[in-house]
């Protein structure tokens, strides 16, 4: 946020002028878009438990073998690890959305994730499915189309933010595939 403000100040200072006109309008647009971004992150964060548990439940419904003896979600400890991993992935997706940049997701979450899952015997196709379900839910919350829960939204189109969060989820899918 400071970068946008700093750019405007530096630009105005180089002209020996007050911040006004198009620079002021650019800041207003930035602030309005920033509020939408904060709201989008808040929608994900305030619904994260629901998003993750629904994704894991959906993954298990489609592959019931995961909760049978020998399955990767069999025993409470493994189920808890699966839910924890879903929470971590969604948390880093929300960080990327907040920053408007995928580097935090790439560096701190995805780097080495596939190799770790392979070493632990985690089926990547199940992870891909869970992330796909989380993606659909996050997009619904951001675009305010979630069927069971509507939220107060800032006026304006949030489709760009919905697309952005979808792209971060797609990065997760690509990283573990």
From Swiss-Prot:
Main location, first listed in the record = plastid
List where in the cell it is found. Answer: Plastid, Chloroplast thylakoid membrane
Annotated Gene3D superfamilies = Phycocyanins (1.10.490.20)
Post-translational note: Contains two covalently linked phycoerythrobilin chromophores and one covalently linked phycourobilin chromophore. In the PDB entry, the bilins are named as phycocyanobilins although the modeled compounds correspond to phycoerythrobilins.
Task: Print the keywords alphabetically.
Answer: Antenna complex, Bile pigment, Chloroplast, Chromophore, Electron transport, Membrane, Methylation, Photosynthesis, Phycobilisome, Plastid, Thylakoid, Transport
* Residues where phycourobilin binds: 50, 54, 61, 147-148
Q: Which residues carry this modification: N4-methylasparagine?
A: 72
Q: Provide the membrane topology annotation.
A: Peripheral membrane protein
- List positions binding (2R,3E)-phycoerythrobilin 2: 35, 39, 158
Which top-level group of life is the source organism from? Eukaryota
Any one Gene Ontology cellular component term annotated for this protein:
chloroplast thylakoid membrane
Concerning InterPro entries, the annotation shows: Globin-like_sf, Phycobilisome_asu/bsu, Phycobilisome_asu/bsu_sf
Residues that bind (2R,3E)-phycoerythrobilin 1, according to the entry?
72, 77-78, 82, 84-85
The GO annotation for biological process reads: photosynthesis
Miscellaneous notes for this chain? The light-harvesting antenna system in red algae and cyanobacteria is formed of phycobilisomes. These are composed of the phycobiliproteins phycoerythrin (CPE), phycocyanin (CPC) and allophycocyanin (APC). Cyanobacteria also contain phycoerythrocyanin (PCC). The phycobiliproteins all share the same subunit composition and organization with variations in the covalently bound open-chain tetrapyrrole chromophores.
Q: What does this protein do?
A: Light-harvesting photosynthetic tetrapyrrole chromophore-protein from the phycobiliprotein complex.
Tell me how this protein assembles.
Heterododecamer of 6 alpha and 6 beta chains. The basic functional unit of phycobiliproteins is a ring-shaped hexamer formed from two back-to-back trimers contacting via the alpha chain subunits. The trimers are composed of alpha/beta subunit heterodimers arranged around a three-fold axis of symmetry. The phycoerythrins also contain a gamma subunit which is located in the center of the hexamer.
User: Into which family does the record put it?
Assistant: Belongs to the phycobiliprotein family.
Name of the protein this chain belongs to: R-phycoerythrin beta chain
Which organism is this protein's natural source? Polysiphonia urceolata (Red alga)
């Amino acid at each position: 946020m400071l970068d946008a403000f700093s750019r405007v100040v530096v630009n105005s200072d180089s002209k020996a002028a007050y911040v006004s006109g198009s620079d002021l309008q650019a800041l207003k647009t930035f602030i309005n878009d920033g509020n939408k971004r904060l709201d989008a992150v808040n929608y994900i964060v305030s619904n994260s438990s629901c998003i993750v548990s629904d994704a894991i439940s959906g993954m298990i419904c489609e592959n019931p073998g995961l909760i049978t003896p020998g399955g990767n979600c069999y025993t409470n400890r493994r189920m808890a690890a699966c839910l924890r991993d879903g929470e971590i992935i969604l948390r880093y997706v929300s960080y990327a959305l907040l920053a408007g940049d995928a580097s935090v997701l790439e560096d701190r979450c995805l780097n080495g994730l596939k190799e770790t899952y392979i070493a632990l015997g985690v089926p990547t196709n199940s992870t891909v499915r869970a992330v796909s379900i989380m993606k659909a839910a996050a997009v619904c919350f951001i675009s305010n189309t979630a069927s069971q829960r509507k939220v107060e939204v800032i006026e304006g189109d949030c489709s760009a933010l919905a697309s952005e969060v979808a792209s971060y989820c797609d990065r997760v899918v690509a990283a573990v595939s």
